[in-house]
Swiss-Prot record:
Family: Belongs to the AdoMet synthase family.
The protein's assembly and partners: Homotetramer; dimer of dimers.
Catalytic activity of the protein: L-methionine + ATP + H2O = S-adenosyl-L-methionine + phosphate + diphosphate
Entry binding sites for K(+): E44
Gene Ontology process terms (BP): one-carbon metabolic process; S-adenosylmethionine biosynthetic process
Annotated binding of ATP, by residue: H16, D167, A168, K169, R233, F234, D242, R248, K249, A265, K269
Organism: Acidithiobacillus ferrooxidans (strain ATCC 23270 / DSM 14882 / CIP 104768 / NCIMB 8455)
GO cellular component: cytoplasm
Name of the molecule in the record: S-adenosylmethionine synthase
Amino-acid positions noted as binding L-methionine in the UniProt annotation, renumbered to this chain: E57, Q100, D242, K273
Keyword list, A-Z: ATP-binding, Cytoplasm, Magnesium, Metal-binding, Nucleotide-binding, One-carbon metabolism, Potassium, Transferase
UniProt keyword Transferase present: yes
Subcellular localization, as worded in the UniProt entry: Cytoplasm
Length: 389
């Protein structure tokens, strides 16, 4: 008898206030890296009615107009009118930015501190995950949740649904049988809108223009449930509806609740922060393990101590799907991947202004040319090393 269960993941649009904050923080990071690839950045953003607050620690030689970077990010997202409740041109921007602590810097700088190699920017544990449910080796629920919010932004910006506004959320519930995705059980999509669109017209348009083009027909069945703006009205949204903060959508950013999470956010952090760079490396490792056919499902944990270059631990878990022992796969990882902070930065070419694009619709499962952690260029090497033919 087959074993059945439901699993749900959510996504939020680029206009969700927490994602606006993430995008501002990563736009600041990109502006610095474009001039100073070795800049140290921990940029935090708060956004609320009529106000953006920029805080954090930044050490750089770059000259950046942080307020303008924040405003232009909000403009690109689409909050361009007081009628929406937030206007990029008239909002206030408050800055309180300090330099990185020299005590932290000496542990990170190569040639300084007790470990003369580049050390980790903090202690912590990070996870990477991959599975063979989709072509991009991501879990099905989060993959389609992201595609729905991406589609909402597309049809808003290209004028097909001009009454849409930037804030939106999606949620996809998938039915699994014997741990394989077989059907979509429930779709939730809530989108901000202009006040003059009726609920009935909105529901029809969202279903036809956003949901149907995204979800595969073979996963839809007669009992699939669609909950579109289930409160009935979503006019007040964005930073007016909720205060946004950097780093509050860490499950949306990763695997939608499948796999584990070490707790560290990504946006606004330069790659010397292992919260970000090691999570990207973990995805790179896990994806190559699955792409190599060593497992159908794989989670990698790596942990660090501040100022120390070598990881303090490495764990591989294939959830019983591995074709060789997990310990053997972990040994192959140590042999073929350099998981020191400096090694990760070089391996994935992370000292580039590539991060604003990561800050909405997921850091993983998007095969953009800049997303080097999505490559599967180690798969053949791993397969050969494992003795698979």
């Amino acid at each position: 008898m087959s074993k059945s269960h439901l699993f749900t993941s959510e996504s939020v649009s680029e206009g969700h206030p927490d994602k606006v904050a993430d995008q501002i923080s990563d736009a600041i990071l990109d502006a610095i890296l474009a001039q100073d690839p070795r800049g140290r950045v921990a940029a935090e953003t708060l956004i609320t009615t009529g106000l953006i607050v920029l805080a954090g620690e930044i050490t750089t030689t770059a000259v950046v107009d942080y307020a303008d970077v924040a405003r232009q990010t909000v403009r690109r997202i689409g909050y361009n009118s007081s009628d929406m409740g937030f206007d990029w041109a008239s909002c206030a921007v408050v800055q309180t930015l300090d330099k990185q602590s020299p005590d932290i810097a000496q542990g990170v700088d190569e040639g300084a501190g007790l470990d003369l190699d580049q050390g980790a920017g903090d202690q912590g544990l990070m996870f990477g995950f991959a599975c063979d449910e989709t072509d991009v080796l991501m879990p099905t629920p989060i993959y389609f949740a992201h595609r729905l919010t991406e589609r909402q932004a597309m049809v808003r910006k290209d004028g097909r649904l001009p009454w849409l506004r930037p804030d939106a959320k999606s949620q996809v519930t998938v039915r699994y049988e014997d741990d394989r995705p077989v059907a979509i059980d429930t779709v939730v999509l809530s989108t901000q809108h202009a006040p003059d669109i009726s609920h009935a017209d909105l529901v029809e348009a969202v279903r036809e223009e956003i949901i149907k083009p995204v979800l595969p027909p073979e996963m839809i069945h007669k009992d699939t449930k669609y909950l579109i703006n289930p409160t009935g009205r979503f006019v007040i949204g964005g930073p007016v509806g909720d205060c946004g903060l950097t780093g509050r959508k860490i499950i949306v950013d990763t695997y939608g609740g499948q796999g584990s999470h070490g707790g560290g956010a990504f946006s606004g952090k330069d790659p010397s922060k292992v919260d970000r760079s090691s999570s990207y490396a973990g995805r790179y490792v896990a994806k190559n393990i699955v792409a190599a056919g060593l497992a159908r499902r794989c989670e990698v944990q790596v942990a660090y101590a501040i100022g120390v270059s070598q990881p303090v631990s490495l764990m591989v878990d294939t959830f019983g799907t591995g074709v060789i022992d997990d310990d053997r796969i972990a040994a192959l990882v140590q042999e073929h991947f350099d998981l020191r902070p400096k090694g990760i930065i070089q391996m994935l070419d992370l000292l580039r202004p590539i991060y604003a694009k990561t800050a909405a619709y997921g850091h993983f499962g998007r095969e953009e040319p800049e997303f080097t952690w999505e490559r599967t260029d180690k798969a053949a090497v791993l397969r050969d090393a494992a003795g698979l033919r």
